[in-house]
Amino acid sequence: METKLPPASTPTSPSSPGLSPVPPPDKVDGFSRRSLRRARPRRSHSSSQFRYQSNQQELTPLPLLKDVPASELHELLSRKLAQCGVMFDFLDCVADLKGKEVKRAALNELVECVGSTRGVLIEPVYPDIIRMISVNIFRTLPPSENPEFDPEEDEPNLEPSWPHLQLVYEFFLRFLESPDFQPSVAKRYVDQKFVLMLLELFDSEDPREREYLKTILHRVYGKFLGLRAYIRKQCNHIFLRFIYEFEHFNGVAELLEILGSIINGFALPLKTEHKQFLVRVLIPLHSVKSLSVFHAQLAYCVVQFLEKDATLTEHVIRGLLKYWPKTCTQKEVMFLGEMEEILDVIEPSQFVKIQEPLFKQVARCVSSPHFQVAERALYFWNNEYILSLIEDNCHTVLPAVFGTLYQVSKEHWNQTIVSLIYNVLKTFMEMNGKLFDELTASYKLEKQQEQQKAQERQELWQGLEELRLRRLQGTQGAKEAPLQRLTPQVAASGGQS
C-alpha cells in the first residue's frame, strides 16, 4: 500500500507531543517571544519539527529494488520515493524508531540504485524524484539563537534530521551526475522557483548541509544552461542584501566558491554584466565585518577576474584602497595578503597606474604599531616578481616609501620589524644607489628643517609668553598707582580732623 506524501508546508499539529500550540500573531508580545526563544534549549530550533505529523501512517519495509523483475522496478521505485517523502521528528530520539529506520534503508537503497543501475531514470519518475527531494530539503530555516553568532568561534546549530537529510542530498547529487540524467526532462521541475529555494538553504548554520548544497548548485549550473543567468542574478541579490541590509548570511563562502569556478569559465571578452558584478558586488564585499569567514574565496574570485581581463586591475586596487580597514588589524593583514595575490598576476603596464597610491598605503602599513601588519607589508619585498616590478619603477616606488622606512627603522618598538626594514633599505640601495643617497640627503635635510621650524616655533611661543607676563605686570602696576596717590590724601585728611 502506498504511503501518502505529506505536503511540504504542513504545519505542526497543536497536539503534537512536546510542542505547544502557536497563538495568533495579534495575541503575541514580540518582546516576550524573543526572550522565550533565547531561553529554549538549542535543539528546539530544528526546522524538521514544523513539518512532522504525529498521526502519519506507520512505514513498512518494501521489497528490495534488486529483488524485483525489471517490469516492476519503476513502480517499486515510485513507492520507495513516496516512503522517503514522509517526515519524522528527530527532536524525540526514541519516537518512530522503526519508521526512521525504514526510511533510512529506503534512502540508502535509492542512492545505490541511482548511482549504479542504468535505465532506472525514465521520464515518469522525474516528478516523484523532485517531489521527494523538495519535501525533505525545502523548509523554513530556524532563526539563529545567537544574534552575535561568530562562525569562527561559536558552535553552529546542527540539523537534527541530518541522518535522513544527508542521504537525500546524496541521492540528489547522484541523480544529477547519473549518465541517464536528462536535463531536457528535469528542467520542467528544476525551475527558477526550485533554484531560488535552493539558494535560500545556503543560510543554514549546518556546514555539512552547505557543503552538499555547494556541489549540487554547481551541478545544476552546469546541467541547466537556461538557469545560469538566473543563478548569477540571485547570487548578486543575496550578496547585495548581505552587504547593505542584513550582514548575515551563512553561505557566502560557499556561493563565492561556486562563483570562482564560474568566473574561471567566462568567455572573453568579459560582458559588462560580469564587470559590474566585480565592481559593484565583489569589491564592496570587502567592507563587511565578517570578511574573515569568506575572504579566501573572495580573493580567489577577484584574482580570477584580473587573469581574465588585466584592464580591471586599476578599478580593483583603487576599490580595495577605498575600503582599506582603519581599525581592524586582522582585516588589514588579509587585505595585504590579497594585494600580494593581485600583484602576482598584475601586468607591468597596469602596475604603473597604481604604484604610487598602492605603495603609499603599504608605507602606512609598515608604520603600523601592530607588528603583524608591518611584517606582512614588508613581506612584499620577499616576492621576486613584485621585487622586479619595484626595481623597474624604483624612481616612483622608493620616494613613496623611503621616508616611512627610514623613520620606522629608528623608532619601531619591535626589533624584528627593524631588521626587516634594514633589509628592505639595503635592497633599495643595491637597486639604485644614487637615488637612495639623494633621498637620504633629502630626508636628513627635511628633518633638519623640521627641527629648525620646531625650535623657531618654540621660541615664538616663549616670546609670546614673556610678552603676556610683561603686560600682566604692567596692568597690575597701573592698578596700584592710584592707590599709592590716594594713601597720602587719606592720611592728611585724618590729621586735620
Swiss-Prot record:
- Keyword annotations of the record: Cytoplasm, Phosphoprotein, Ubl conjugation
Which InterPro entries has this protein been placed in? ARM-like (IPR011989), ARM-type_fold (IPR016024), PP2A_B56 (IPR002554)
> Which GO BP terms sit in this record?
cellular response to growth factor stimulus; negative regulation of G0 to G1 transition; positive regulation of neuron projection development; positive regulation of neurotrophin TRK receptor signaling pathway; positive regulation of protein-containing complex assembly; positive regulation of transcription by RNA polymerase II; signal transduction
PTM field:
Ubiquitinated by E3 CUL3-KLHL15 complex; this modification leads to proteasomal degradation.
Compositional bias segments (type: Basic residues): 34-45
* Region of interest called Disordered, as start-end residue ranges on this chain: 1-55, 475-497
- Protein localization: Cytoplasm
Q: Chief subcellular site?
A: cytoplasm
Q: Name one GO cellular component term.
A: protein phosphatase type 2A complex
> Which is an annotated GO molecular function term of this record?
protein phosphatase activator activity
Entry's induction text: By retinoic acid; in neuroblastoma cell lines.
Tissues in which the protein is found? Highest expression in brain.
Low complexity composition bias: residue spans: 1-19
**SUPFAM superfamilies to which the protein is assigned, alphabetical:** ARM repeat
Source domain of life is: Eukaryota
Q: Give residue numbers for the modification (Phosphoserine).
A: 32, 35, 44, 46-48
What PANTHER family does the database record attribute to this sequence? SERINE/THREONINE PROTEIN PHOSPHATASE 2A PP2A REGULATORY SUBUNIT B (PTHR10257), SERINE_THREONINE-PROTEIN PHOSPHATASE 2A 56 KDA REGULATORY SUBUNIT BETA ISOFORM (PTHR10257:SF4)
**What family does the Swiss-Prot or TrEMBL record give for this protein?**
Belongs to the phosphatase 2A regulatory subunit B56 family.
Q: What does this protein do?
A: As the regulatory component of the serine/threonine-protein phosphatase 2A (PP2A) holoenzyme, modulates substrate specificity, subcellular localization, and responsiveness to phosphorylation. The phosphorylated form mediates the interaction between PP2A and AKT1, leading to AKT1 dephosphorylation.
Know the name of this protein?
A: Serine/threonine-protein phosphatase 2A 56 kDa regulatory subunit beta isoform
- What high-level taxonomic lineage is stated for the organism? Eukaryota, Metazoa, Chordata, Craniata, Vertebrata
Question: What gene does the UniProt entry assign to this protein?
Answer: PPP2R5B
